[in-house]
Amino acid sequence: TAAATLDGPVVFYWHGTTNAPAQAEYALGRAQIDAILAQGGVVIAPEHDPAAGILPWFLADGVRDDDLRVADELLACAAMRVGVDARRIHSVGLSAGGFHTSVMSLRRASYLASVVSYSGGLTATMAPTSDAPGARFAALVLHGGADDKVFPYVLQTTSERYVDFIKVRGHFPVLCDHGQGHDIPAAVRASAWRFLQDHPYGATPSPYATGLPAGFHPSCALVP
């Protein structure tokens, strides 16, 4: 396999409430997963611990770092077993997984190059600190508009809060309102993967700083 000879990207996928790791295939897209594997990369879609509560990840509604420590261990295992490109470690999450990815982007800024949050962001009680204050990452932040709600959360609001939170701290967000509610439209998945590829670790300034590339999903825009 390509992983045996190439040190490729690592993409974590954190699923939403009532979902499972297999959701990664829909969320990332089969074509994108095949591209990751062809580059010698790995998709890591963890199982959640039922002890996390109603939401599947501890950091989606709390402060315990169990899932971060699992991510650290899985990443170390991938590096040892197949080899990884340390500049191309990414996280993607939907809903509760989007909350987790948003918090993880700061709590693991030491190794995350770029992230994609679908209907995630930060709630009013979240203010994560960076484990690498000098590091800068890029985030593609997507929500489904005013109808993107899962009680008690309005995901447009949480997504915008995350964008504001990271931008003022020097990170690079791109915000997308795809207008299709609490979902991942199939048409955005290629742009999400392109975003991750175009933002390896330390890509500052972003190659998108002066504008999004041609063909990028039209719901997305730079944050002024």
Task: Show where each model-derived region lies.
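Primarily recognizes the serine-hydrolase "nucleophile elbow" in alpha/beta-hydrolase
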Residues: N19, A79-R81, A86-R136
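Alpha-helical scaffolding within the catalytic cores
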Residues: E25-D34, L74, S102, G120-G134, ...
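C-terminal catalytic histidine-bearing segment of alpha/beta-hydrolase fold enzymes
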Residues: A139-L142, V154-P224
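Alpha/beta-hydrolase fold active-site loops
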Residues: P9, G41, A113, F137-A138
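Proline/glycine-enriched tight loop/beta-turn segments at coil->beta junctions
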Residues: A2-V10, G134-R136
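Acidic beta-to-alpha connecting loop that harbors the catalytic carboxylate
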Residues: T17, H48, G145-D148, G179-G181
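Serine-hydrolase catalytic machinery in alpha/beta-hydrolase-like enzymes
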Residues: L6-R87
